[in-house]
Amino acid sequence: MQNQQEEISSTQTTTIEVLPPVLQLRASRDQPSRHDVRWGTDVIDNENMNKKKTKICCIYHPQDEDEEGCTSDHQHEEPPESSSSSSSESENDKDLGFDERRKRRVERRRRKLRDNTDSAPNAYEVQPDYSEHRKKMMEKKSNNT
């Protein structure tokens, strides 16, 4: 009777390997490669001359030739010491390390900017206002149609 009460159970494990899907990208050979610039509607027409721009130009601030980073090979004639208008701090810069020269250079630039705060910015630093010009151009377009 004991044989009858025993149940025979068996389990079977099946392992299925699932490979990740592979995506292959191929360039289309039908379309020729064209690199056209497409300007957005927010791009400004520079004084109606069909010159488009997206932002104000960068302003290059040249370094003084006495400062670190001047890589030119030519030699400059030293001005006589009596006519030198530079302060004693720039004469001592040659004896200082890179970090100290940089700190002094930055401080001179800040001082110069602070002293020149009353001067007006140049034309490259101010975005021109073309709103009146745009209105006139829109009126011309509407009158022509």
From Swiss-Prot:
Organism superkingdom: Eukaryota
Major location category of this protein: nucleus
Biased composition (Low complexity): 1-17
A UniProt-annotated Pfam family: PPI_Ypi1
Keyword 4Fe-4S annotated: no
Keywords: Nucleus
Subcellular location: Nucleus
Composition bias type Basic and acidic residues, residue spans: 27-39, 91-101
UniProt feature, compositional bias: Basic residues: 102-113
Chain segments carrying region Disordered: 1-41, 64-145
GO CC list: nucleus; protein phosphatase type 1 complex
GO biological process: glycogen metabolic process; intracellular monoatomic ion homeostasis; mitotic spindle assembly checkpoint signaling; regulation of protein localization to nucleus
One GO MF term attached to the UniProt entry: protein phosphatase activator activity
Function: Regulator of type 1 phosphatases which maintains protein phosphatase activity under strict control.
Family per similarity comment: Belongs to the YPI1 family.
Protein name per the record: Type 1 phosphatases regulator YPI1
Lineage: Eukaryota, Fungi, Dikarya, Ascomycota, Saccharomycotina
